[in-house]
Amino acid sequence: TVYRVCYQSLWEDFVVAGTARLMDEYGLDGVYLDGTGCLLPCYNHYHGCGPRDGVGRAHPRYTFWATRSLMRRLWQVVSSRNPNGQINLHNSAFMTVPTIAFATSLWDGEQLSTTPGRTLPERMPLDYFRTEFMGHQWGLAAEFLEYVLPYSYRQEWGLTLLHDVPTRPYGPHDQLELASQLWNLMERFGRRQATWLPYWRNGDVVTVQPSAAYVSLYRHPRNGVLAVVYNYGARATEVTVALQRAKLGLAERVVATDALTGMALDCEGGTLHLPLDSLGWQLVWLRQEQ
């Protein structure tokens, strides 16, 4: 059972005070909030909601400012006790900027259980992902929620890696193993120091075929290029990626490897030919030949 509450009530003080007490008693690093930043209708006239019209019929009130006040106060509680403290907000589909602005990260995706469509591209067009799930326009780190879609954890990582977004492990132990491999890879490559070149903005340095395939790139000043190659098509296919090596700061002769397994890949002339299943992906690390 899910119990919804309105923060234009004593619940605001209750949640804030309870969070402060728990952090003080147990030294918590922060809080996970499940839907706390969502705006929901309230009809309770005892705390100022549910205004009535001329015939006595109650109407809902959406308490933006009360919910924003709660989130702001929670941020003050967490950050004053731990400057690196986390407010991890699960707010699927409710991208209400006044309330989510005080979180440190977002977890989004549960609404996809009811999104129309038979295949993943039908249920998640790429412009939909860019609009809601990247976190850039909210100024927040984003994670993707994967457990509602009928696809494997690995398959969903392809979609999110393409957008520089991690898929949170939630379930079997092998999910954490894959996630940790990817986290470690990004640390080794130097993702924080790299320039990200997403698939919709890198046509001057790379081309990819067929049309249902995409590639996003990370360009590091010393460590080469990390390519995320993804087949968003309905069938297995060979994906061809042609890199403009000079524009990417790569030497004429480069070494290409599968970034997770270390397996050598052919990159003759700066071109990769990768057989990928539908929703399959591969991370390719390209470096100067030693």
Label the model's feature ranges.
Residues T1-Y26:
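Active-site-adjacent "subsite" loops/lids of carbohydrate-active enzymes
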Residues G262-A264:
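Short, solvent-exposed loop/linker segments at beta-strand-coil boundaries, enriched for Pro/Gly
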